[in-house]
UniProtKB/Swiss-Prot annotation:
It comes from the Eukaryota. GO terms for biological process: binding of sperm to zona pellucida; egg coat formation; positive regulation of acrosome reaction; response to progesterone; response to testosterone. The keyword Secreted applies. Glycans are attached at residues 159, 168. Detected in the ovarian perivitteline layer. Detected in granulosa cells in ovarian follicle (at protein level). Detected in granulosa cells in ovarian follicle. Residues 427-437 are cytoplasmic. Changing residue 90 to A: Abolishes secretion of processed zona pellucida sperm-binding protein 3. Keywords: Cell membrane, Cleavage on pair of basic residues, Disulfide bond, Extracellular matrix, Fertilization, Glycoprotein, Membrane, Secreted, Signal, Transmembrane, Transmembrane helix. The lineage of its organism: Eukaryota, Metazoa, Chordata, Craniata, Vertebrata. Its main location: membrane. Belongs to the ZP domain family. ZPC subfamily. The gene is ZP3. This is Zona pellucida sperm-binding protein 3. Changing residue 335 to A: Abolishes secretion of processed zona pellucida sperm-binding protein 3.
């Protein structure tokens, strides 16, 4: 495999009422053409016929991932110490020397996993990292790094024992009904904003289209703002290195840089939706080729006008000025000075102090806010390593890799024990990252 990081995708689901089931397995192998990778029940490892390099079990409180050390189907076993789970780089739980497998077992919230909330589903997203150690001669390596995204899907209304999941909710403000629900979400969208898109296959020079939303069961009129966004190499926005994309209560500061086109999209499709685009980037000096973006989303009543603390401002390079999505241009004046806090908080804070002070802040009942993480967004090391999505049989989706790239895409048909359901990677709704308040 040449010139890039391998990206594989796994998806695992639990269906309401299913207490346990045999985990689904996926096999893959190279068949002549080094770019012609395939997944499915008929694939065979060149080392061990019928072996499954990666198997996932989505259990009630944890996930269990088993990785065969012949990860690439070449007959060459990788070093178990080179495999880790999640952004926190958790080590394996056990080794099976007889079967040459490495097993990771971790709680659903452990090892830096990201949880997503959709109206019907809880989605836990993590990844397996393969970072090969140098060969005996430290100036060379013989295999490429690999990132294997993993998702576990659970019904939000019921758990696997058929007992209702009862999350704790907070009302929008004291005037709203206690039955109301606020669900904040970030979605990665296609170029025309019509559908969600996978998190893989981005290259430097591409654009990330991000859609922020808030929904309530009773549809109380709300206006959504993206207060701040920080990119990092993990879901922890406080980690280092980090990069501020949106700051100062809604100023898209990345668009102020000369070589970017980052901006909010005007007009909004709805008051409770806000879209913005950013130019793809990576962190210099880091070979992981991935980023997480943590955004602080908040809402105000729809009839409350924008102000310096509640705004969405982009920098217009042609006019050399900041412009708002709505409201008077005066609300954006503070974007240039960086002093957008109300008088009581007007002291100049560094970006991380501002970030920490805003987490889940409620301002006298006028706003409800939450931090939402989107990622990992995976970058292709090689130009042209973007797959094309096609529909496959039995509800599966097929990601067809471009010829000559190191990107491995998948076709998945998942069989759940006693349940006649098939699900696939990159289906609509599987790339949404949300937070419920």
């Amino acid at each position: 495999m040449q010139g890039g990081r391998v990206v594989l995708g796994l998806l695992c689901c639990l269906v309401a009422g299913v207490g346990s089931y045999t985990p689904w397995d996926i096999s893959w192998a190279a068949r002549g053409d080094p770019s012609a990778w395939s997944w499915g029940a008929e694939a065979h490892s060149r080392a061990v016929a019928g072996s499954h390099p990666v198997a996932v079990q989505c259990q009630e409180a944890q996930l269990v991932v088993t990785v065969h050390r012949d990860l690439f189907g070449t007959g060459r076993l990788i070093n178990a110490a080179d495999l880790t789970l999640g952004p926190a780089a958790c080590k394996h739980s056990s080794l099976n020397a007889a079967h040459n497998t490495v097993t990771f077992a971790a709680g659903l919230h452990e090892c830096g996993s990201v949880v997503q909330v959709t109206p019907d589903t809880l989605i836990y997203r993590t990844l397996i990292n393969y970072d090969p150690s140098p060969a005996s001669n430290p100036v060379i390596i013989r295999t490429n790094p690999a990132v294997i995204p993993i998702e576990c899907h659970y019904p939000r209304r019921e758990n696997v024992s058929s007992n209702a999941i009862r999350p704790t909710w907070s009302p929008f403000n004291s005037a709203l009904s206690a039955e109301e629900r606020l669900v904040f979400s970030l979605r990665l969208m296609s170029d025309d904003w019509s559908t969600e898109r996978p998190f893989t296959g981005f290259q430097l020079g591409d654009i990330l289209n991000i859609q922020a939303e808030v929904s309530t069961e009773n549809h109380v009129p709300l206006r959504l703002f993206v207060d701040s966004c920080v990119a990092a190499l993990s879901p922890d926005g406080d980690s280092s290195p980090h990069y501020a994309i949106i700051d100062f209560n809604g100023c898209l500061v990345d668009g102020r840089v000369d070589d970017t086109s980052s901006a909010f999209i005007t007009p909004r499709p709805r008051e409770d939706v806000l879209r913005f685009r950013i130019d793809v980037f990576r962190f210099a000096g880091d070979n992981r080729n991935l980023i997480y973006i943590t955004c602080h989303l908040k809402v105000t009543p729809a009839d409350q006008g924008p102000d310096p603390q509640n705004k969405a401002c982009s920098f217009n390079k042609a006019r050399n000025t900041w412009v708002p999505v709505e409201g008077s241009r005066d609300v954006c004046n503070c974007c240039e000075t960086g002093n957008c806090e109300p008088p009581a908080l007007s002291r100049r804070l560094n970006p991380m102090e501002r970030w920490q002070s805003r987490r889940f802040r409620r301002d006298a009942g006028k706003e409800v806010a939450a931090d939402v993480v989107i990622g990992p967004v995976l970058l292709s090391a090689d130009p042209g390593a973007v797959g094309q999505q096609e529909e496959g049989g039995d509800g599966a989706a097929v990601m067809v890799p471009s010829v000559g790239t190191g990107l491995v895409c998948v076709a998945v048909a998942v069989a759940l024990a006693a349940v006649g359901v098939a699900v696939g990677i990159a289906r609509k709704g599987c790339t949404r990252t949300s937070a419920a308040v």
